[in-house]
């Protein structure tokens, strides 16, 4: 038996496992997983641990990345709207948006003319409305292609998540407007990045899906460990018995009760996390 038998470690990808913020803003190639993080994760798995990624990325944008990472657990996608097993190439759980989301968001388009957003689905299809430079950089970063439409009413269903991409005061105004709508409580609305505002189905959060994943794997909550850097990670950090964040995390994450701060993502935070887990799970406890 390994020292990490029965332990689940779930990590956010962007700016937690791999630092991608610079590439998103400037365009460029996705950086690889660092050698230090890779070796630490491989050691964790060799000692019986289950390593999973919990990401806001959609299936088409994470599918090319998954084979490059050491993972032995299913992946949480779409910010908690699905669990996907890359080994079996199938969804284990989905919680997609109701079709009515298109009618709910149509008036938002009217108020914010030229609204930029990405719309994701169960498969590899992506639709975009009014792409801007941020959208194009995001498409390059996620190695994705998309079909451009002019209205969300044209978008086919089912929809897994809607991702708005607006910057500056317009982005702030958009978030305030969306959160003020009478239907806002029917969905999950969360910032997943500095300029990203996402809508998923009610209950479709990383926290809800990490609970489901732990149950699926028969992992006790006391052995669930999570690490993340942004607001969309807070639900799973709150669920975890051992919650971590890299020092580049936003302030709200850093102030989450029980959070343990690590080095910056660019300084191999996940490698430090695994070293911390060695202290939590010494050999004599196995």
Enumerate the language-model features and the residues they cover.
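Mg2+-dependent phosphoryl-transfer enzymes with acidic/Ser/Thr/Gly-rich catalytic loops
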Residues: 4-8, 33-34, 198-286
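Asp-based phosphoryl-transfer active-site loop
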Residues: 6-27, 237
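Short, acidic loop-to-helix structural element flanking the phosphoryl-transfer center
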Residues: 28-49, 94-101, 143-146, 201-215, ...
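Active-site phosphate-binding/coordination module
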Residues: 34-134
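Residue-level signal for inorganic ion chemistry
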Residues: 44, 79, 162, 237, ...
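Short active-site oxyanion
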Residues: 46-52, 72-73, 161, 222-224, ...
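Short, structured coil segments at secondary-structure junctions
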Residues: 69-71, 79, 87, 185, ...
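Conserved acidic, metal-coordinating active-site core of Asp-based
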Residues: 114-227, 231-236, 248
């Amino acid at each position: 038996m390994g020292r990490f038998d029965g332990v689940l470690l779930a990590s956010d990808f962007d700016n937690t496992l791999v630092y991608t913020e610079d590439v998103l803003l400037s365009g460029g190639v996705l950086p690889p997983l660092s050698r230090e993080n890779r070796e630490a994760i491989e050691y964790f798995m060799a000692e019986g641990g289950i390593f999973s990624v919990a990401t806001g990325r959609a299936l088409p944008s994470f599918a090319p990345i998954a084979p490059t990472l050491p993972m032995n657990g299913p992946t949480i996608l779409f910010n908690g709207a699905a669990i996907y097993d890359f080994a079996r190439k199938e969804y284990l759980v989905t919680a997609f948006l109701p079709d009515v989301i298109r009618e709910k968001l149509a008036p938002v388009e009217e108020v914010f003319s030229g609204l930029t957003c990405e719309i994701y689905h169960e498969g590899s299809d992506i639709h975009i409305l009014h792409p801007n430079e941020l959208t194009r950089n995001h498409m390059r970063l996620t190695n994705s292609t998309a079909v451009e439409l002019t209205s969300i009413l044209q978008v086919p269903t089912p929809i897994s998540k809607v991702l708005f991409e607006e910057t500056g005061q317009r982005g702030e105004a958009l978030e305030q407007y969306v959160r003020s709508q009478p239907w806002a409580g029917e969905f999950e609305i969360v910032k997943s990045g500095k300029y990203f505002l996402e809508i998923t189905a009610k209950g479709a959060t990383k926290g809800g899906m990490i609970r489901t994943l732990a149950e699926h794997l028969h992992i006790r909550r006391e052995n669930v460990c999570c690490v993340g850097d942004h607001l969309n990670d807070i639900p799973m950090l709150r669920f975890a018995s051992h919650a971590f964040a890299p020092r580049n995390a936003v302030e709200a994450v850093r102030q989450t009760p029980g959070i343990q701060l690590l080095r910056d993502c660019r300084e191999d935070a996940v490698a430090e996390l695994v070293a911390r887990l060695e202290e939590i799970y010494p050999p004599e406890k196995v």
